[in-house]
Amino acid sequence: MKVDLSPLNGIISDKAFQKLKSINNPSLVHFLSKTIELTTPDRVYVSFGEEKDREYVKKRALETKEEIKLKMEGHTIHFDHPLDQARAREDTFILTDEKIPFVNTKPRDEGLREMLSLLKGSMKGREMYVGFYSLGPRNSKFSILAVQITDSPYVIHSENILYRNAFEDFYGDKPFLKFIHSKGQLDIKKRRIMIDVKENTVYSVNTTYAGNSVGLKKLALRLTVTKAVNEGWLSEHMAIVGFEGNRGTHYFTASFPSGSGKTSTSMLGSLISDDLAFIKEIDGVCRAVNPEIGIFGIIQGINERDDPVIWDVLHKPGEVIFSNVLMTDDGGVYWEGSEVEKPEKGYNYEGAWTKESGKPASHPNARFTSPLTSFSNLDKDYDNPQGVVIDGIIFGVRDYSTLVPVTEAFSWEHGVITIGASMESSRTSAVIGKADVLEFNPMAILDFMPLSLGKYLNNYLTFGRNLKYVPKIFSFNYFLKDENNKFLNSKEDKRVWVKWAVKRVESETDAIYTPVGFIPYYEDLSKLFNSTLGKQYTKEAYELQFTLKLSKYLEKTERIMKIYSEIADTPIEVINELKAQKDRLLDYINRYGDKVSPFQLVKS
């Protein structure tokens, strides 16, 4: 079937016209022409990912003042609206006529009417930008094609950093995900993000914050989760990182809610992904790739001592977009928690700023955007079309009172259900609302869940049953506090928990059986603290960190059981696994009381 490009004649450049003609993709042309007709831009720039396209987009970002050039070569800064600083949960909808627990839905016809009304003529007086990308390594079993349309050069610049340009891969009538964004008038009351799963299309308007506007980031995750569940693989909010053991590199995926340790964990080994993972069973083995080739990371708290790899990226020439940090008068940047001297004045997302105002210089959800190739710890297989074999899965939370620093699950089912599906974590600044409220957030993906948790978990359990080699599952918690509200661990201690997990993967160390999983022996951690961090690890510290608060674990298990018992399609395995854990906890409470020291468990 020959593609009809007549609707685009005279609207796009001759070069773009000929290139689109060459790939013969009617669905793509239809999508472009309909979006142009809806949004009525003055001009359309079709970016094919060539160097001159990338340079043009960067130039336009500066000309439109969506970005400002900084003194370091390649560095720019972007400011979002003061009320558009994080993912907008309340303005984000899955378009479906179903009512889905924990999912913000809107009837599809109603949502489309509202969205198309907001987008109508939204690009008048502006230039439209079109980009073509692949989520995952190009021409691989993992690759998913996507098209972004936007009137924001900052958005398309971000996507050129974060994703693989892949125009040539659209040859023929290949399916692709569709993303339409307009900054509109930045009327926050009319900010809307709507995900039409049925048509694999996401609409976004009156916002520029990347989590709401960069389509291939978390907006695409809703579409790829749906695709994964329907096809029997996993699309996850997970880092992928390689950790060295005595038998070579072991790759782990790591799921943490935003701002809870995912990026810092991904910097402890060889980096493949800091945020997202496509995971498939290939010949009975669990393999994963990064859909992205860049990082959109939280910058608050990044300092030279704790985060040397990221610090280096942010202080050398190269492509970096800072967002919502402080810009100093000399074209430098400052962010809270950087542990450098705070400047006297500058400019941030609220306008002119002075130290004497007492206000924070940067937003707690301020970000940086950089290509993976800028990171010194980048793994050689970061773009391997075959992916990497996954030996372990980490589910981490920000839990101040209950979970011990590290636990290993008894099995795939036990780990998926009592660790991953039971995650509760304190809310962070990455979402709009009150911080430090404990939230149910299974697999750290609830914000991006487009379907029933029951269906999602059933796919997880089925996926595990199809594996011949099953990764071990671990619970991590870097944020446990004592009764005086002081953290029980330093930032660097996470290196030890990782080392212990690697030793468990290599079957090099035993562990203590508890009702909630396996925990480390003191002697093993003492050796690891010495060899990894060069510091002494006391029995007192170990006991404080690994004493199991049985009553609190029981309360948590009962909370989670209640949640899943009220979801109609929850697999029976979920309830049975949680009930078995509850029974074990009741048995231990009967034997030991509300708490039990790990030393008591060793003696028993």
UniProtKB/Swiss-Prot annotation:
Binds 1 Mn(2+) ion per subunit. Coiled coil: none annotated. It is found in: Cytoplasm. It is an enzyme of class 4 (lyase). The active site is at S260. This is Phosphoenolpyruvate carboxykinase [GTP]. Catalyzes the conversion of oxaloacetate (OAA) to phosphoenolpyruvate (PEP), the rate-limiting step in the metabolic pathway that produces glucose from lactate and other precursors derived from the citric acid cycle. Its EC number is 4.1.1.32. It comes from Sulfolobus acidocaldarius (strain ATCC 33909 / DSM 639 / JCM 8929 / NBRC 15157 / NCIMB 11770). Substrate binds at R87, Y209, A210, G211, S258, N365, A366, R367. Pfam families: PEPCK_GTP (PF00821), PEPCK_N (PF17297). Its cofactor is Mn(2+). Its main location: cytoplasm. Pathway: Carbohydrate biosynthesis; gluconeogenesis. It catalyses: oxaloacetate + GTP = phosphoenolpyruvate + GDP + CO2.
